Curated annotation (Swiss-Prot):
This is Homeodomain-interacting protein kinase 2. A motif (Nuclear localization signal 2 (NLS2)) lies at residues 804-807. Residues 845-952 are annotated as: Localization to nuclear speckles. It comes from Mesocricetus auratus (Golden hamster). The lineage of its organism: Eukaryota, Metazoa, Chordata, Craniata, Vertebrata. Autophosphorylation at Tyr-361 in the activation loop activates the kinase and promotes nuclear localization. Sumoylated. When conjugated it is directed to nuclear speckles. Desumoylated by SENP1. Sumoylation on Lys-32 is promoted by the E3 SUMO-protein ligase CBX4. Residues 595-772 are annotated as: Interaction with DAZAP2. The modification Phosphothreonine is found at T141, T252, T273, T482, T517, T566, T660. The record marks D895, S896, D956, S957 as: Cleavage. The active site is at D324 (proton acceptor). GO terms for molecular function: ATP binding; protein serine kinase activity; protein serine/threonine kinase activity; protein tyrosine kinase activity; SMAD binding; transcription coactivator activity; transcription corepressor activity. It catalyses: L-seryl-[protein] + ATP = O-phospho-L-seryl-[protein] + ADP + H(+); L-threonyl-[protein] + ATP = O-phospho-L-threonyl-[protein] + ADP + H(+).
Amino acid sequence: MAPVYEGMASHVQVFSPHTLQSSAFCSVKKLKVEPSSNWDMTGYGSHSKLCSQSKNIPPSQPASTTVSTSLPIPNPSLPYEQTIIFPGSTGHIVVTSASSTSVTGQVLGGPHNLMRRSTVSLLDTYQKCGLKRKSEEIENTSSVQIIEEHPPMIQNNASGATVATATTSTATSKNSGSNSEGDYQLVQHEVLCSMTNTYEVLEFLGRGTFGQVVKCWKRGTNEIVAIKILKNHPSYARQGQIEVSILARLSTESADDYNFVRAYECFQHKNHTCLVFEMLEQNLYDFLKQNKFSPLPLKYIRPVLQQVATALMKLKSLGLIHADLKPENIMLVDPSRQPYRVKVIDFGSASHVSKAVCSTYLQSRYYRAPEIILGLPFCEAIDMWSLGCVIAELFLGWPLYPGASEYDQIRYISQTQGLPAEYLLSAGTKTTRFFNRDTDSPYPLWRLKTPDDHEAETGIKSKEARKYIFNCLDDMAQVSMTTDLEGSDMLVEKADRREFIDLLKKMLTIDADKRITPIETLNHPFVTMTHLLDFPHSTHVKSCFQNMEICKRRVNMYDTVNQSKTPFITHVAPSTSTNLTMTFNNQLTTVHNQPSAASMAAVAQRSMPLQTGTAQICARPDPFQQALIVCPPGFQGLQASPSKHAGYSVRMENAVPIVTQAPGAQPLQIQPGLLAQAWPGGAQQILLPPAWQQLTGVATHTSVQHAAVIPETMAGTQQLADWRNTHAHGSHYNPIMQQPTLLTGHVTLPAAQPLNVGVAHVMRQQPTSTTSSRKSKQHQPSMRNVSTCEVTSSQSTSSPQRSKRVKENTPPRCAMVHSSPACSTSVTCGWGDVASSTTRERQRQTIVIPDTPSPTVSVITISSDTDEEEEQKHAPTSTVSKQRKNVISCVTVHDSPYSDSSSNTSPYSVQQRTGHNGTNTLDTKGALENHCTGNPRTIIVPPLKTQASEVLVECDSLGPAVSTGHHSSSFKCKSSSTVTSTSGHSSGSSSGAIAYRQQRPGPHFQQQQPLNLSQAQPHMATDRTGSHRRQQAYITPTMAQAPYTFPHNSPSHGTVHPHLAAAAHLPTQPHLYTYTAPTALGSTGTVAHLVASQGSARHTVQHTAYPASIVHQVPVSMGPRVLPSPTIHPSQYPAQFAHQTYISASPASTVYTGYPLSPAKVNQYPYI
């Protein structure tokens, strides 16, 4: 054993054990801590690398430690590990090994009142006792001394566990475990016991004013954890309680998604609060030290900045201030496996913004915000200042403002950035410590004291610790310019540095009210890398995009899903029998992230036996999993279809876990025996196998109104852009998916036919508040023409689901994708409120979905519920102008440069046709209108998986390409299917330019989009009449796509964006981009760049008008090198997963389609 006790020396003495190289206590140096700094623990020893451990934390298990029987033990079946917190007055606990019979646990003194809480979600700093930071002062004379001793032990013969129950010859305090400073007296291999787990102390990791951190082994597992043992000194008791309360609040959030360190439990040991955290690898300060404090390239700073800004965004949304952000408190998770994956640690100084006190000592000095130094009121913005100092230190390799005192700190800031504003200095309570007011001037101004004046007043000598002295922050761009870059790479580096300095200046704004926020930081071009799109062929740019892959969300966010009040409402009835077989791949038995079962409570109603357990936690992570959600008959809003059978049974071949999006909990398992029963016949059921994890988190269905996600009050009073920015989806590499909603519609399913359900997710922007309120009220009886999905971007590294980010100005209408089984089948379906029919009478339309496992086809009949379709079907042209705002813009593509069938040579003329023989048609030649007042919307078309065949999609043909001068009009589209059209136009190859269009008033018409989801086979377009035929684009869905969205907020860009054709936008409205990566050499793929055009309508290609709720969803097929602009490279992002088909829900119906259960193989070299 190696007990630890506090000596009185001013340095650390080390008595090495027998194995010197394995000791965690060697090579520690003098600890320098600033006086009265709560958490200014700095520096690490040379052996600072910590072992990483498995992130799969099993559920809590009841401890077999003998404890007083009056203590209640928490239920081990709860989804989170439970915590027992003993009040500080209860004395201490003497613990034994797991099965020791020689010693019994006793609780000494104090009542037995216990507080149980859930897992906490952050790890505080793993700081080694050692390596001083430059210019830090120390006044604490205590030190740590390690002595090799062998105290009396109790050996358990049965289990072999050893517990040290006696102590050393050193004197201890009356607390029986603490010294005079309140630090716990550590004993190596000592056992720390919570109510659920037992931990053995392995190494001493570090200590600070908060206490100390030890590396422990969780007995019975192979997990290594870090336990933070807080001091029990009265002066730290209050802050310890605050830290525990903040960790308890953060325990409800996703630590991985928001880049917090996960904490497992909290317990009391010998009157000391112990916090158990996951073990991380290395902090950024050690990382810099390991690299000899060399500057870090911007391509590595960017992912660190993005992840920490995401953490600050979540803290800001919770009203929390970290208050001690610095390189030591940013930990690398696993540098070898996940380069530059970081998490924020140490919430010992954190507080709620409402409880912030101006005189409170906060933040380490180098990273201390001016408002703290001057004694001004502060808020979460102090963390953004600290983050700016951190990224500047990473860029320089040395602290930007390494002040040895607060005077030096404000002096450095003022010399580089200028004096704080006069109103700030006048309001500061500590201003007079560093500034003098010039009373001789008629306008008294503040003047910084000279170093001599300050030394004369305080006796503190000013020091110069800066490595770089800048007259302004812009001078930083000239530091450490790399010389090994040539050509475009050098231009990329210079552009990157300009954006970095621009962001840094906004983060280091002295006035906190004007300082950039975390969400704005995540939308800054430096983070989104929009400025790098000008250099698509640069290897440096490719490397930048690859490094940002680590910033993707691990799972889709579940917090915004819970805001959805609309459940999945779709009437499903079997067509020929009462049996429906659900077939799943055996691959679907893996749970990548263990979520909470709480969000599934609304779905797991009667007739839905669900069982929690741990059997479904598999060792092999499988991102290609699906989940089955079975909604019981008791689900509200599921009326039976009167013409169909009333019920059916469900059989499953193997158990499939239901995965929701709350990490750390257990999955739900549907047992086959329970699902094989026949359900009651009073109502129909929904079987929604969500096609990847975006659909697995189901919101609590407290209301069954067919309404949009955003409540009426919010839609009418709050700008949607602000509402969306309050969530974490300001990050475009860690996007958030809200729960989509399938709208009402009767769908007929055949017997014994495997099916999956997908929903095309769309997003809307806030229209005028009156418009939103009016539309919400107008469609309140049946919100069938309102999409209830609010989505920014959906991306998950644990799922092959690729993101679709859609930007719109008004609530969107759902787009519908149709499919046909053979060349002779012509399928039509109503779009929006317009029923597609051969005659003016309402009739059912069929959608035939061939499924690979079955030779038969599924016929889905879709009909409307009310007379709205009929009324709108006969609506005159005059009503269209009111409805055109509900139309979503789409991508257009040519068949070939010479295949334009229009007799009008003007590229901006509009040709209009009406439907004929039940076929919805649309023909626009890309009108550019100035007078249109309709708000444009865009939808990013989802790509198809490789198992799906070529898709025939009717799309608007654009005349001569609206070019920005970067590209020609000879972009070829590859297609493997031969298609014949009655107009005689071959669509084997097509060319065109992507355009942004708005709606234009015009005659009432409809559109058809037949889609073939079966194997590749020729198709024939439906017969049409009219002098002009619309061009047809054929999609060969064989490319995997890694879509990213890049907001473009730069006001300096002109109306026409250089990257895209005819892009008109406002500075406040970001552009959206989608990147693709080819899966193999010569493979074809789908790329869609859809940008909501803002501002000038002259650069906007517009639709002719058609009824509300029609959505154009047009994929564009292009080769690997064929993109709308040569400035956009097709392979900025390496593809990880193949595409699957997205299906959107229309107001009157819902389309189902089959998903391939196995992902397509991706080329190892996506950039070839």
